[in-house]
Amino acid sequence: MKFLDQVKIYVKAGNGGHGSPSFRREKFIEYGGPDGGDGGKGGTIYLRSERNLNTLIDYRFQQHHKAGRGVNGSGQNRTGHSGEDLILKVPIGTQVFEEDNKTLIYDFKKEGEEFIVANGGKGGLGNTRFKSSTNRAPKKFTKGAPGEEYVIWLQLKTIADVGIVGLPNAGKSSLLASITNAMPKIANYKFTTLNPNLGVASYDDKEITLADIPGLVEGAHEGVGLGIQFLKHIERCKTLMHLIDITDEDLENTYKQVRNELGSYSKDLLEKKEIIVLNKTDLLEEEEVKEILKNFSKNKDSEVVTLSTLEKGSISRIKAKLLSYVS
């Protein structure tokens, strides 16, 4: 799927309808008494979190959003209809920021949350409201109030069961394509993944959401490579799957490099559950794989397993393993 994790939009709630200056039309009675109704309230704009959304891409081309205007009041004390509300749907994990893109307004963490981002304007008052003992034929009425309008930023922090991390070209996209319905771009060079890819793996009648995070390089927490804009997507994943190319000349250094970047961004990332996966075992002999696994597993707090995305049995085993981690 196309992915967009940050977008600026303009929202304008509906203006309130104007009050009516109407008078009853009665024979031989001047003005006939006021009967002007109030204006309707302007439509309000809501943000609502939806589980079936994974990206903000819909807002890339539609950046201006307006709710309906309240209808003007009319004679016979008729109040105008309220303007139509507007509900903007966003993925779970979306954060709402003010125009400075720094001040957090709201954070969607659960399905079905609603947040009023712009209130509709109040309807104006009809002239009936101003009738008194000293003024039985008031011509006064008020106009509807303008609806609130803002420029806001929407930022998405992916909420997935499993975040796949590793150096560029570790095989993350191939793994995601093998075990889920995702179709990430795959090639044998660094930074094939330029945006987080999302997929859902089904196993034993259960589903696991996985996020393929763009490859980390040294200095990523300072913006090197694809930078910290993607590290934020790891924060809300329940489990980290650390993918390492088993043919790498220095597995230990490769592992530490990624862990250092995670820790430099946030120490909390190092506290997450982690499973280490040595990938591309099909490139080595079976005995060599066993020896590497034995040596690399020493002094590791996390479980270490092997994987070949070309073998169906290997894919099934990793699905079952991931399910046990997130259940």
UniProtKB/Swiss-Prot annotation:
Record-level Gene Ontology MF annotations: GTP binding; GTPase activity; magnesium ion binding
Cofactor: Mg(2+)
Keywords: Cytoplasm, GTP-binding, Hydrolase, Magnesium, Metal-binding, Nucleotide-binding
PROSITE patterns: G_OBG, GTP1_OBG, OBG
Subcellular location: Cytoplasm
SUPFAM superfamilies to which the protein is assigned, alphabetical: Obg GTP-binding protein N-terminal domain, P-loop containing nucleoside triphosphate hydrolases
Keyword Hydrolase attributed: yes
Top-level division of the source organism's lineage: Bacteria
Gene3D superfamilies reported for this sequence: GTP1/OBG domain, P-loop containing nucleotide triphosphate hydrolases
Chain positions recorded as Mg(2+) binding sites: 173, 193
Chief location: cytoplasm
One record GO biological process: ribosome biogenesis
Domain OBG-type G positions: 160-327
Subunit structure of this chain's protein: Monomer.
Protein task: An essential GTPase which binds GTP, GDP and possibly (p)ppGpp with moderate affinity, with high nucleotide exchange rates and a fairly low GTP hydrolysis rate. Plays a role in control of the cell cycle, stress response, ribosome biogenesis and in those bacteria that undergo differentiation, in morphogenesis control.
Protein name as it appears in the record: GTPase Obg
Source species taxonomy: Bacteria, Pseudomonadati, Pseudomonadota, Alphaproteobacteria, Candidatus Pelagibacterales
